[in-house]
Amino acid sequence: MGIFSIANQHIRFAVKLATAIVLALFVGFHFQLETPRWAVLTAAIVAAGPAFAAGGEPYSGAIRYRGFLRIIGTFIGCIAGLVIIIAMIHAPLLMILVCCIWAGFCTWISSLVRIENSYAWGLAGYTALIIVITIQPEPLLTPQFAVERCSEIVIGIVCAIMADLLFSPRSIKQEVDRELESLLVAQYQLMQLCIKHGDGEVVDKAWGDLVRRTTALQGMRSNLNMESSRWARANRRLKAINTLSLTLITQSCETYLIQNTRPELITDTFREFFDTPVETAQDVHKQLKRLRRVIAWTGERETPVTIYSWVAAATRYQLLKRGVISNTKINATEEEILQGEPEVKVEPAERHHAMVNFWRTTLSCILGTLFWLWTGWTSGSGAMVMIAVVTSLAMRLPNPRMVAIDFIYGTLAALPLGLLYFLVIIPNTQQSMLLLCISLAVLGFFLGIEVQKRRLGSMGALASTINIIVLDNPMTFHFSQFLDSALGQIVGCVLAFTVILLVRDKSRDRTGRVLLNQFVSAAVSAMTTNVARRKENHLPALYQQLFLLMNKFPGDLPKFRLALTMIIAHQRLRDAPIPVNEDLSAFHRQMRRTADHVISARSDDKRRRYFGQLLEELEIYQEKLRIWQAPPQVTEPVHRLAGMLHKYQHALTDS
């Protein structure tokens, strides 16, 4: 496909984006808004953002959800801006500095919350800054300005949603159904690989792919939940399927690890059974029926615990899968599965990374303020706004540098494109609203196609072009003002990019160590006799941390294996029949405190000291288990855990 070619699958969204822009433009001028540009800009960003992220037309519900987040972020930002102005109206410089800190604070929060919700906080940060900067000439008009901006933004969001509904958005339900079938086959094939106990790298690749696919399925569940309330039952089932899929991965990998020391546990009966190849979900269904008969014949005691648990989880997966596909009423058996253990929320491991993002945003905004005050440039305020926008939105993404480059390319492309519209097209459409709508629809259509291709600079060009062309009421054509706005955007993006380069993010290794120590803490916390604690479902949180580790350190197999081993240890100890007595319970609390100290230690020396203390406590704990005559189901996992911690002591403590 050529660089300027148009694929059929890109046309519908391009028309949708053009329609959203035209609707916002028409409504803005029809209701005599002072700056319809904000409504048009909002409609374009809300519609195009999910398409750029997805690399194609977004699924149903994505645009609505983004619009909802934008409304929340705008209102939070407006309220914060009003509070800052009311409190500091007599100290303008202090007021702007506080706004810079507010933008950094919102970026810090957006780095810690779920990626889906971080957009609202990023928006809240720079909305307050926009209000404070814009009202500098007339601060008494602040409430009116805030209300007008909110109204224009809400109109833009409504127009984007109307365009989305008008062009029948894609439903993700069929993709979910196909993935459920395919994922079950992949789970069975992973178990086959683990029982064969073949090449470790092949097994690592297989379970790594399954972790990514299970995480992707969880993302599909979020999309399905946003799409319509009629999928509420399917959403409940998919939430339980996520845990079951992670359980299947854990049991398969534990089957592989067990054979490193005790290969005789997997009998020839099961080896021969899992030799039969499977290609479809129907093949897996037949094999599971046969496998349940084999287990009933051999007995639970003669069946390895990992295989028994795997078959139980796969059977539940199958049952819920059928319910998701048919979306029928939840029956009593399904309800029993769905009323499972409460999920534990994951503890953020990127606090240092979030603090780096805080300083990047705050310093870049302060640098923009100094540049504005030092030069006295009329578009210094525009540069400041672009600095806040770039840093607030870039920091929450995995590669902020590339986001800043995208904005630079976009603002550079917007200069000639905006010039064409400002000097030629818009002046010649002054007598016709229809011609004005058509001209902007053409802009939205072609940039909508480029956005779906994820062309570098396309998203920035769309927003920057709309921002600098004259879409005010009434329209005024001052070339110096246009040039100032265009150059202000470019300078702001370059300054933001400079700060991102200068304030280096060296938090990757620290985040990796925190994640690994959180796995250790989870394994240690599984050693408990507290019934409520044992019923907590840590698996989704642990695999979410593993997925983050895989993204932070792609290809680092030793780290992945260590993390997976800790997850397996956690699951095994959680189900182990630990003797119930006060002596062991008190020691469990002591070990949990020590594990927490390892995570929170700020220096390598303290971390090594607490880790050494944890190893000593594990030795004492093993002795206590022998005194209290704990069964092998308890002593063996604890011994394996202690051995792993001894082996990887330096990786878990050294910076």
UniProtKB/Swiss-Prot annotation:
Keyword Transmembrane helix part of the UniProt annotation? yes
Instruction: Read off the lineage from the record.
Output: Bacteria, Pseudomonadati, Pseudomonadota, Gammaproteobacteria, Enterobacterales
Q: Which organism is it from?
A: Escherichia coli O9:H4 (strain HS)
Membrane-topology annotation of the record: Multi-pass membrane protein
> What is the annotated role of this protein in its UniProt record?
Forms an efflux pump with AaeA. Could function as a metabolic relief valve, allowing to eliminate certain compounds when they accumulate to high levels in the cell.
Query: Which UniProt keyword terms apply here?
Result: Cell inner membrane, Cell membrane, Membrane, Transmembrane, Transmembrane helix, Transport
State what protein this is by name.
p-hydroxybenzoic acid efflux pump subunit AaeB
UniProt entry tagged with the keyword Membrane: yes
For this chain, the family text in UniProt reads: Belongs to the aromatic acid exporter ArAE (TC 2.A.85) family.
